[in-house]
Amino acid sequence: MQKGNIGVTTENIFPIIKKFLYSDHEIFLRELVSNAVDATQKLNTLASISEFKGELGDLTVHVSLGKDTITISDRGIGLTAEEIDKYINQIAFSGANDFLEKYKNDANAIIGHFGLGFYSAFMVSKKVEIITKSYKEGAQAVKWTCDGSPEFTLEEVEKADRGTDIVLYIDDDCKEFLEESRISALLKKYCSFLPVPIAFGKKKEWKDGKQVETAEDNVINDTIPLWTKKPSELSDEDYKKFYRELYPMSDEPLFWIHLNVDYPFHLTGILYFPKVKSNIDLNKNKIQLYCNQVYVTDSVEGIVPDFLTLLHGVLDSPDIPLNVSRSYLQSDSNVKKISTYISKKVSDRLQSIFKNDRAQFEEKWNDLKIFINYGMLTQEDFYDKAQKFALFTDTDGKHYTFEEYQTLIKDNQTDKDKNLIYLYANNKDEQFAYIEAAKNKGYNVLLMDGQLDVAMVSMLEQKLEKSRFTRVDSDVVDNLIVKEDKKSDVLEASKQEALSAAFKSQLPKMEKVEFNVMTQALGENGSPVMITQSEYMRRMKEMANIQAGMSFYGEMPDMFNLVLNSDHKLVKEVLADEEKECSAAIAPIQTELEDVTKRRDALKKKQEGKKDEDIPTAEKDELNDLDKKWDELKQQKDSIFAGYAGKNKVVRQLIDLALLQNNMLKGEALNNFVKRSIELI
């Protein structure tokens, strides 16, 4: 029996492994099974070039559980005593401390950097045994034993067959790994597609009302997964079946892209466009990354363009440096090439479907839209390609490319400044009246109700030349596309003031909502009262909800305009009745107000250009008194108008109709509206 110390050139490796890799200690199974697969594949390679002439036999790798042990067994090339000394005992571990400090939270980086796959066994074991026999003719089987200290023993033993058994004596604080369900789950996670059969226990069948083991190995992996096959050999059903195996709870995918490239890097895989039902489905950890069919991670940021991390599927590449920091990964030239390649393949596939089967593309547009819009917003190269197949959808459900839509609206939706005006709605039901008003003017209205459409509108205004997007409820229909300079409202100022004061007094109090009342001549057939919302302010608030650094807008109240149509019969009747009821009370106040206004304006003109210290105190006091008097008289007038409006049910009825049209009338206010409607009828 040989005894000795492991050749570690710095501190003892085992406490380091346990300390720094504990958070990821489940990867020990991946590392040990992968090593067994490597040993098996090496034997296959030697046999193929006639350097091994013996029988290959069953090459299945077996994982088995004992009372306190896990054993991983293979029939690969095995090891001689000299090879154990070279590959197990002599660990090139110089500079370890600096590296461990840098990557102390990344088990993959430490294990992969030093080739320490085997030593991951000590993360969960108090003792490890290697019982191995080389494939070489006349080789002597040996047993290596280590209890987690730098000391080991190596002795000759009897072993009938070539290959290696690694026996882990599990630590007391890692007993979870002796549970069949735990090991089964880890094998499924890490080893489902390894290229050599992996057996864990025996298959079970129901017999006499209970499950019993059969003599057949329970092979847990698919050795030739779909992505390793040629696309020409596969049917649509093959791709769908594989998707169901990967994501059993998901709906059928929209379509898929089979990746297969050998130069200038190696990459295979299948990416699926999933059917997204809601924000909940937007999970970025659904692409599985493999290295030579060994599962590595489902965190592919930096490898896959950000907008494509929403996709599902698998990627397999030996050229992606898997065990390094994220910052290094993002600067790696191969990774950049792979990311660019994947983006190009996706855009080419989308372009192909659009060109060859536009009907199918349009049918799936609502599901594809989230991916395509995300890509256009985040990647310039993708925008340049996607603008040829990205679609607008109007409120009638018709689809247009950007170029097609510009052609459609340029004659009727160009304003006086030669801007192309894209009218849109984000809720067909709530904005129905506004949509219909626009369509009656011959305008087309887009439906932009997607999760990213707020951001898309802002981006497209920058990308599309002389183009502006305006929501249909942002103004009255005649002002949505201003084709010539408008004449000012013909209603005189005193009448506008009377109407505005009356209606403003009856507006409901709403939390974080403010109204501005105005009058406009909108024609006899226009609505008597409408509610609009400034495009700019509304858009700023919407952007504040999705973009950091704009919280100022998010905290501001919603600003709405209550627009009174001075041409409408009902508004005219309210005005005439208001003048009749209020004129006697208003007249003396108005006379006094005009006198105050005249004197105040004269004083202000007199003080123009003077420094404050040059204005007599008496004049300052008089102006201050006049300001207070003016406010007082204005309040008296408004109070009279408010008193009238409170008695005229038509005023509140018209306001409530406008609120109802905008889905802003609820609860008690809605109940009062219904009662009032019955009374008025």
Curated annotation (Swiss-Prot):
PANTHER family: HEAT SHOCK PROTEIN 90 FAMILY MEMBER. Keywords: ATP-binding, Chaperone, Cytoplasm, Nucleotide-binding, Stress response. Belongs to the heat shock protein 90 family. One of its GO terms (cellular component) is cytoplasm. This is Chaperone protein HtpG. Its main location: cytoplasm. It is found in: Cytoplasm. CDD domains: HATPase_Hsp90-like. The lineage of its organism: Bacteria, Pseudomonadati, Bacteroidota, Bacteroidia, Bacteroidales. Residues 601-620 are annotated as: Disordered. Residues 546-681 are annotated as: C.
